[in-house]
Amino acid sequence: FTARDIYNIAKKLGKTTEHVIQECGEVSIGYSSRIPLVHMVPIGLQRRCPLLRDDGRCSVHDCKPTACALFPVGRVASIEGVLDKNMEVTKDCVKVRYVLNDFNCGSAKRHNTIRSWLARFQIPEEDDFFLEWTVVTANLSVMVNKMENLHFPSRTLEMVWNIIFSLLYVNYDTGKEFMPQFELAAEQLNALCRKFWSLEAEETEDSSIDKPKMPDLL
C-alpha cells in the first residue's frame, strides 16, 4: 500500500486511514529499507483479498490499490546520479520504468498502450505522487539505516518509526484533497532527513559532539 492507496480506499469506504490499515493490512519494518511498510493481509481459508465483496467483486474497483490497477504492468523506480550517501534524493534522480509481468488471463483481443492502461484508474503516466513517494521513502531509508549503523537507542528508533508511520500513512483527512496533505508530510519528513544529515556532518567535524538526539532533529 502507498499512502494514496490507503487514502483512496478510506474515502471510498467512508473510513479513516487508520481503520483501513487495521482492517486490511499489517505494518512491518522493511528488511532493507528499514522504514514502516503497510502490506495487504489476505483473509479466510482461501486467503482472499480483504477488499473483495461476498460476490467476488472488488469493493473499491474504481480506486483499487495501484499494484492491482496496474497488473499485469509493473512499475519500477531507480535512483540515479546520487554519488554521496548523504546527498538528498530529489525527483531529478528518479527514473521510472514500466515492465510487463507474465499473465494468463484476458482474451488478448484488445491492445493497450501504457498510457491507456494507466488511464483506466486515473493514474497519470507522469505520476508526480509516485516520484515524490519514491523520493521521501528513499531519503528516509538512508536516514534510518544510518541511525541503525550508528547504534541509536531502540527507543529513539521506535520514535522515528512512529513519526514516519503517522506522517506518511495515517495523518490524512479524506474530506480534503490528498496531494497537498501528502506534499506537506513529505516536506516535513525530508526536512527531518536534512536535519539529521546536518547534525551528523557537525559530529564528523567535531568528534566530541554527542550523537544526535531526536529532540535536536525535531
PLM features: what roles do these ranges have?
Residues F1-L218:
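Short loop/turn segments that flank or connect secondary-structure elements
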